């Protein structure tokens, strides 16, 4: 059940994941334009987001020990995790998929 707070107060794990991804994209754009100083600034910001995400995943509230597929797919797709976290998230995602009979449960993936 969604409330107004779901839109007004972003989930920190989602906001951090997408911020890291956007900063990586901006770094690529600046690099392609020949603006290496700006590209490096974006890459550094993205690296900080990844470290923040890794720390967030070590907390109980945002643990990778979940059946929530989005919480496992985002960090894997965006390369946000440390090696051990990545290995755990991959195994945990397989477990989550088995638990849901291999149904994709992420809302944005089901939309047309």
Residue ranges and their predicted role:
Residues 1-112:
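Active-site core of glycosidic bond-cleaving carbohydrate-active enzymes
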């Amino acid at each position: 059940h969604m409330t107004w707070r779901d839109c007004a107060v972003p989930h920190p794990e989602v906001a951090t994941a997408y911020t890291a991804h956007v900063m990586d994209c901006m770094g690529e754009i600046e690099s392609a334009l020949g603006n290496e100083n700006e590209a490096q600034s974006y890459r550094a910001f993205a690296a900080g987001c990844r470290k923040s995400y890794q720390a967030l995943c070590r907390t109980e509230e945002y643990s990778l020990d979940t059946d929530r597929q989005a919480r496992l797919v985002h960090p894997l797709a965006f390369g946000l995790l440390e090696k051990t976290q990545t290995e755990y998230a991959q195994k945990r995602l397989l477990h989550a998929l088995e638990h849901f009979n291999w149904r994709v449960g992420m809302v944005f993936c089901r939309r047309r």
